[in-house]
Design a protein with these regions (language model features):
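Bacterial Sec-dependent N-terminal signal peptides
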Residues: 1-26
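Mature soluble domains of exported/periplasmic/lumenal proteins and thiol-rich metal-chelating peptides
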Residues: 24-115
Length: 115
């Protein structure tokens, strides 16, 4: 009986481990054009995306102004990610920057501003 129980527990742990592992394969990636200008913009966008449920990682390329976001589609979607960027004060593809978020940006991070 103990051997059967130990065998069942081993199978259970393996099945759970494989399920957790398989979840990583289902992550998606999206590239979003932003209105970011400087390293402060990059830091602000990446930091706020880190708090978005389901976002695994983000990286903003300042040269292209494109943020690449890896996310779990079961926990978030592209619309929520764009809304997060907008609320932070930046354009996100066709979604324009939220006025309140934009007003909070330092002048160097606003359109036409430079470091």
């Amino acid at each position: 009986m103990k051997k059967h129980l130990a065998g069942l527990l081993t199978l259970l742990f393996l099945a759970v481990g494989l399920t957790v592992q398989a979840g990583d394969d289902n992550d998606k990636e999206v590239k979003i054009k932003t209105s970011a200008i400087c390293s402060m913009c990059k830091e602000r966008i990446e930091r706020n995306l880190a708090f978005e449920k389901g976002v695994k990682e983000s990286n903003l390329d300042l040269k292209d102004k494109v943020v690449t976001v890896k996310y779990n589609p079961k926990k978030t979607d592209v619309a929520k990610i764009k809304a997060n960027i907008s609320k932070t004060g930046y354009d996100a593809d066709e979604v324009t920057a939220d006025e309140k978020g934009y007003a909070k940006l330092p002048s160097c991070c606003k359109k036409g501003g430079h470091h």
